[in-house]
From Swiss-Prot:
Taxonomic lineage of the native organism: Eukaryota, Metazoa, Ecdysozoa, Arthropoda, Hexapoda
Provenance organism: Drosophila melanogaster
Domain of life according to the entry: Eukaryota
Catalytic activity: hexadecanoyl-CoA + H2O = hexadecanoate + CoA + H(+); S-hexadecanoyl-N-acetylcysteamine + H2O = N-acetylcysteamine + hexadecanoate + H(+)
Entry function: Catalyzes the cleavage of thioester bonds from S-palmitoyl-CoA or S-palmitoyl-N-acetylcysteamine (unbranched structures) but does not have activity against palmitoylcysteine or palmitoylated proteins, branched structures or bulky head groups. Conversely, hydrolyzes both long and short chain fatty acyl-CoA substrate.
Protein name: Lysosomal thioesterase PPT2 homolog
Amino acid sequence: MRLRLQVLVALLTCSSISVSLAYKPVVILHGILSGAESMASLVREIEEFHPGTIVYNCDKFNGWYSLENAWRQVDQVRDYLNEVGKLHPEGIIVLGYSQGGLLARAAIQSLPEHNVKTFISLSSPQAGQYGTSFLHLIFPDLAAKTAFELFYSRVGQHTSVGGYWNDPQRQDLYLKYSEFLPLINNEKKTSNSTSFKMGMVRLNKLVMIGGPNDDVITPWQSSHFGYFDENMDVIPFIRRPIFTSDSIGIRTLQEAGKLIIVVKPHVHHLAWHTRRDVIHEVIFPYLD
């Protein structure tokens, strides 16, 4: 009887260890005007309910430094993901929140040989941003309709926001001056266009999370690559060139069953990574 009990305990211990080892490491990138500490609730939930998970809570470009040029940030995030990936050849999961999701996506695209298995974009402006509520968090005296005068300039492009400010009624200026979003979305062809697409289609899973009550990402459908047209009507991503022309591989991922779109109502932008029920419903299913 004593031997059987010892064997049972050993089996349960081995089972627990194997489950822990099964969870892939998770890299988390914070949003704008915040830092790694803002993602602490999410880290605690992962560590409590997925014990043994290695979590890398990236602390680069905290606070006002998060307003630095987007490519400068992407370069460091790319190197960070590359180093973490080398430590875990079995593959990693990357979760980027808000601006962090956009920077993380660009970093992944810049690593065509990455080993990111799942990328979770948590309420991130993947198709750009155009809205007063977001703008006034950072530039209180700037109006959305005239923000292009700042952002579509050499000075404006030194800010991260300028890199993904997408004025639907100033598309000529957006394509002419913006040095970030049109490139990673392959709206402007460059020598990196092919590798940017390769970085995306290399993913096993792309999870896009957002919702209609976000109140910061504008339009909220940008979290799923949807966006305004020149008449300010929101066009869903499946009707936009980024999907129909498969410019960065989103259509390829969808056809392979690797694209997951999550729409969650009644969640404010600041709650996606802090509300326990939201974390468990929209994030945990994709942490394997």
